[in-house]
Design a protein with these regions (language model features):
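Short, charged, surface-exposed hinge/linker loops at domain edges
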Residues: 1-4, 38-74
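Short aromatic-glycine-(Arg/Gly/Cys) micro-motifs in beta-strand/loop hairpins
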Residues: 8-23
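Intrinsically disordered, low-complexity regions
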Residues: 15-16, 31, 56, 64
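Extended aliphatic helical segments
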Residues: 18-20, 27, 71-74
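Short, flexible helix/strand-to-coil boundary loops that buttress conserved ligand/catalytic motifs
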Residues: 20, 30, 48
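Hydrophobic residues in alpha-helical membrane-spanning segments
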Residues: 22-25, 60
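A short, exposed loop/beta-hairpin motif centered on an aromatic-Gly-Thr core
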Residues: 24-33
Length: 74
């Protein structure tokens, strides 16, 4: 079983965009947080399925670190 970190971003027009940093281009959307997470799981599964079909390596979150930077408002 694989685990991936996801980032949810609330959109001004409503809903949530989900990004999977370890899987480039794996982005999805949901109207609610719950739906966004559900859609992320589906997107990750389809992404990995496509990688397997093409014989490509499956990236993991191993060695991935998260850090929040605060910068001045210039």
């Amino acid at each position: 079983m694989l685990s991936y970190r996801i980032i949810l971003r609330k959109e001004p027009e409503g809903g949530f965009t989900v990004i999977v940093p370890s899987l480039p281009g794996c982005v999805t959307y949901g109207d609610t947080i719950e739906k966004a997470i559900e859609m992320a799981k589906e997107a990750i599964e389809l992404y990995i399925e496509s990688l397997k079909e093409h014989g490509e390596e499956i990236p993991t979150d191993d060695g991935t670190f998260e850090y929040t930077l605060t910068v001045s408002n210039v």
